[in-house]
């Protein structure tokens, strides 16, 4: 069995793509099971692919939240003279949302809970200055403890340019907020728009527009209003309104990720963890008087 970084023993391959494979591994130092994303040597040698993997590690390591897959470590290992980058993450058991949705729309309460938890995870990211930029069903895994966001590989810091130097936009066309097409700066409102698309898709089994190609999707984001939600038995009006508001063409008209998470969690009666809003503690007159007296002594 392969050993990485002097501590991670690869045990079982969980999946493989063009750029990387994902393994179940054992952390010999902390004696726990982890997941390891292992880049191919070719992609490790590719500057863009390597930077994307490192960006995923750095973005995910900025904060911890129960609805975000935790990042533990990043490093490189050499074998047969070739370097291989690896990312060590929380090992989660569950199904990706895109696979679950192959069976059709979700019950509105399930859809509401999933998107409330995604919103809560994003609220934590936004609170630490991170915009995910690629929220979609394939990047959400459903576990026994709730939904978890995956893959911060194309994440950006709030205020950073929202495109590569050559003008390329990172993300998935079906979930790109209209303002992202103007190639401005990364902002949390774009993630909220993607959650709006996700919620609509969970409720209906389809995208909010009749678009089949990338070009049609980009045109829809810019110019087409979303199709009204169909009648869904039991769906609270405030959930439908939240979905519509999240899909606003104007970023300033969308709710924050915190507001989205809290409204949806209340609608389905499932608590979520959102960052606290810190405010100065009010000082009562008697406390202020006591403090003043203490200073004057």
Segments and roles (model prediction):
Residues 11-17, 22:
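Protein kinase glycine-rich loop
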Residues 40-62:
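AlphaC helix of the eukaryotic protein kinase fold
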Residues 74-77:
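Activation-segment/catalytic-loop signature of the eukaryotic protein kinase fold
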Residues 81-96, 100, 104:
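Conserved short submotifs of the Hanks-type protein kinase catalytic core
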Residues 114-115:
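Activation segment signature within eukaryotic-like protein kinase domains
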Residues 119-130:
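Protein kinase catalytic-loop region centered on the HRD/HxD motif
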Residues 191:
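Conserved catalytic-loop aspartate of Hanks-type protein kinases
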